[in-house]
Amino acid sequence: MQYQEVAGGICAPKGFAAAGVHCGIRANHNEKYDLALIKAEVRCAAAGVYTTNKVCGAPIKVDRAHLKDGYAQAILVNSGNANTCAANGVALAEECCALVGEALHIPAEDVLPASTGVIGQPMVIDPFARGIPAAAAKLTATAQGSTDAATAIMTTDTHKKEYAIQFELDGKTCTVGAIGKGSGMIAPNMATMLAFYTTDAAVSPALLEKALKTVVPGTYNQMSVDLDTSTNDTLIIMASGLAGNPEICEENADYDAFVAALTAIAEHMCAEHAGDGEGATHLITCEVTHAPDLKTARAVSRSVVCSNLFKAAVFGRDANWGRILCAIGYTPGDFSIDKVCVWLSSKAGEVYVCENAAYHPYSEDEAAKVLAEHDILVKVDMGTGEASAKAWGCDLTYDYVKINGDYRT
């Protein structure tokens, strides 16, 4: 399937506007945007997936209630405070939804809140009471609106994350756009990671939810920075239907094409998140092929990108392939490692370091050149089947410890 990258992020699909403002949630950052608002022209089919952490943010509890009917029209996101483990958290999130509803003239139940930031900090309504009307007044269906919203949700991210692609459904041009944040507390089973998708494809609520839950296991659940699963992981999608394609109401060719488009944009966003891991100097992608089954392929690729020993080796530009084999070896499951082959690759070239689970002659100098690049691909051929999977991670650096040691200061 062909995709074309387009500008505009979440405002690229028809029917969406966005804004970002500073409202004072980040009291020690006088100018930094800390509140994002996304609004649809029409009531949208909507779906979400959330953290697996038993401690979850108050906004997630509100989202789950508001999404029971499968529809939404606005998303409100704040950074600087997670609204987690706060006595008044749910009530405050509901009050924020009411303020958005009042500002946009929509039901409060059609508003989905999300928060990211420090866990366990008190939260008050005052900044939201100022910021929500300001964000509503600033809403724009332009690329700048998406950029401002993407900027407002950042915490320790070093750059904004947004992307959009176009594709065809039944002769109609459809668009999917995304923004996201997250560079720490990122581990499989969603990550401290917020992601918001918009699309103008017409998809029923039931099929939209199914599509999202089909895409997440092979993308967002395959991403890791530090093995910490956040309390606030949130991925929400709204579908306006304004592209004019026949509504996808069953699992047919159009549904498969839509899932493929979602997968493409999710893979791009995962690479953006992992490559911007706290203190990271390298994006590590592990691509497993010829695994005995999909479960094993996913588990092995996750093990490699989660290995602190291998992550540290990449930081040191050390082609220590034994650490890759070690990570594969402790992966749960019943599979053989006898035919495992490993390559390290980047735009500087490729080195074949392991053949049939044993050393393959290579140049350490060439390997160091490969590992000097930002984007590193680890190719693992298990030689035992036809299944494949990817996972995304980053190297482990001194700065990761420094950033997290200073997080609240």
Each model region followed by its residue ranges:
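A structural signal for small-residue-enriched, beta-sheet-centric alpha/beta enzyme cores
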Residues: 1-91, 95, 101-409
